[in-house]
UniProtKB/Swiss-Prot annotation:
The active site is at 101 (phosphoserine intermediate). Binds 1 Mg(2+) ion per subunit. InterPro entries: A-D-PHexomutase_a/b/a-I, A-D-PHexomutase_a/b/a-I/II/III, A-D-PHexomutase_a/b/a-II, A-D-PHexomutase_a/b/a-III, A-D-PHexomutase_C, A-D-PHexomutase_C_sf, A-D-PHexomutase_CS, Alpha-D-phosphohexomutase_SF. The lineage of its organism: Bacteria, Pseudomonadati, Pseudomonadota, Gammaproteobacteria, Pseudomonadales. This is Phosphoglucosamine mutase. Mg(2+) binds at residues 101, 240, 242, 244. Its cofactor is Mg(2+). GO terms for molecular function: magnesium ion binding; phosphoglucosamine mutase activity; phosphomannomutase activity. Belongs to the phosphohexose mutase family. Catalyzes the conversion of glucosamine-6-phosphate to glucosamine-1-phosphate. Its EC number is 5.4.2.10. Pfam families: PGM_PMM_I, PGM_PMM_II, PGM_PMM_III, PGM_PMM_IV. It is an enzyme of class 5 (isomerase).
């Protein structure tokens, strides 16, 4: 059965445009509450990032859940992985995140966690979708859900993050710049690193509801690069708006992406005999990551793009680490979902154990030139990926690369975009092919 509302990462869109409206969120809260109550008594955690519309949608979800008889625990602004963790530790039936991740403030969305802190099973998502098409009812007033607020949520999560670092290890003498993207990590991330001994300069930690991800964070890393250089910091850490993505900047100002961070973590586990299997990347992972892991005899597999698919592959194989070049990094030895703070801590630990700088550690992975171009296709009824001209051009490029690279065309799961990616050993050739393919995709979408 195809989904009407749920995409690869929940439900997302422009605030005020269906389904990102208060009336839909009320109905969604009710439908979710009814679905979760079928599992027994129901308690649901609700958290959000810092965008202004989160208050409106929090109230709507709260009302819908209560109408279905579900008790609601409000967390306030918290990183997405914190909501997964707290859902687990409170033994709740589910957790709900109000966030549009790295998108601007005028977008918002909803995603769910199961009681185990993992993405919601497909059958529960489908049950919620079916209930959304049914008339809304209200349980007897004696069975309405109660609502309360967890006032120590941030402190609980800070202590959890710190517990991933051995008590014998600290980060004294380490000079960090941390960019919180005016998002959900603005309180907890600086506290975690400072309490572990690091000297921390904080950027973009003054959310006003409108400035989340605005020219800051992991999608706009220029100000972090400048701050690292000006402050002579050892490295910089950039989070996205909901705290599930992380990128870094070394002391020279060079960007260290998710592929490189994943390699540093995996190599550290491998050297200590704790890797447990291999590494999961995605179709977008740089070929250089695959080759660097191969040099260490570490197995590597590619999942579909999206942290839920990385997580599913890890669970199926019983492996521990995986991630995306965008900065989603999953460490199953600590978490049940991508957690930017946990991933950053594991990188810092790996550097400490080896006595390396971040700039030195990233040299072990030689990335292949890769060009990614996003093409917006709007309301076009043409499927560009199935268009004969696009298929033929893609095949020609693959043939021209002669086994020295690869081509990937795919639709974004969260935005109306086609992502055109070409990768190979010749940067000029890669860019020429990517630009030609992107131009063709744009033409057939008109």
């Amino acid at each position: 059965m195809s989904r009407k509302y749920f995409g690869t990462d929940g439900i997302r869109g422009r605030v005020g445009e269906y389904p990102i409206t208060p009336d839909f969120m009320l109905k969604l809260g009710w439908a979710a509450g009814m679905a979760f109550r079928k599992q027994g008594n129901c308690r649901v955690l609700v958290g959000k990032d810092t965008r202004i519309s989160g208050y409106m949608f929090e109230s709507a979800l709260e009302a819908g859940l209560s109408a279905a008889g579900a008790d609601v625990l409000l967390l306030g602004p918290m990183p997405t992985p914190a909501i997964a963790y707290l859902t687990r530790t409170f033994h709740a039936e589910a957790g709900i995140v109000i966030s549009a991740s790295h998108n601007p403030h005028d977008d918002n969305g909803i995603k769910f966690f199961s009681g185990q802190g993992t993405k919601l099973p497909d059958e529960i998502e489908l049950m919620i979708e079916e209930l959304l098409d049914q008339p809304m009812t209200v349980v007897d007033s004696s069975k309405l859900g109660k609502v309360s607020r967890i006032n120590d949520a941030a402190g609980r999560y800070i202590e959890f993050c710190k517990s991933s670092v051995p008590t014998s290890t600290g980060f004294e003498g380490l000079k960090l710049v941390v960019d919180c993207a005016h998002g959900a990590t603005y309180k907890v991330a600086p506290s975690v690193f400072r309490e572990l001994g690091a000297e921390v300069t904080v950027l973009h930690a003054q959310p006003d509801g409108l400035n989340i991800n605005e020219n800051c964070g992991s999608t706009h890393i220029e100000s972090l690069q400048a701050a690292v250089l000006v402050g002579h910091a050892d490295l910089g850490i950039a989070f996205d708006g909901d705290g599930d993505r992380v990128l870094m900047v070394d002391h020279t100002g060079a960007i260290v992406d998710g592929d490189e961070l994943l390699f540093i973590i995996a190599r550290d586990l491998h050297e200590r005999g704790k890797l447990q299997g291999g590494v999961v990347g995605t179709l977008m992972s740089n070929l250089g990551l695959e080759l660097a892991l191969k040099d260490l005899d570490i197995p590597f597999v590619r999942a579909k793009v999206g942290d839920r698919y990385v997580m599913a592959e890890l669970l199926e194989r019983g492996w521990l680490v995986g991630g995306e070049n965008s900065g989603h990094v999953v460490c199953c030895n600590h978490t049940t979902t991508g957690d930017a703070i946990i991933a950053a801590l594991q990188v810092l630990l790996a550097l400490r154990r080896r006595g390396e700088t971040l700039a030195q550690a990233r040299q072990a992975l030689r990335k292949c030139p890769q060009v990614l171009i996003n093409v917006r296709f709007g309301a076009s009824k043409v499927d560009p990926l199935e268009h004969p001209a696009v298929k033929e051009a893609s095949a020609r490029v693959t043939e021209d690369m002669a086994g020295r690279g690869r081509v990937l065309l795919r639709k974004s799961g969260t935005e109306p975009l086609v992502r055109v990616m070409v990768e190979g050993d010749d940067e000029n050739q890669v860019r020429t092919h990517a630009e030609a393919l992107a131009k063709l995709v744009a033409e057939v979408c008109v």
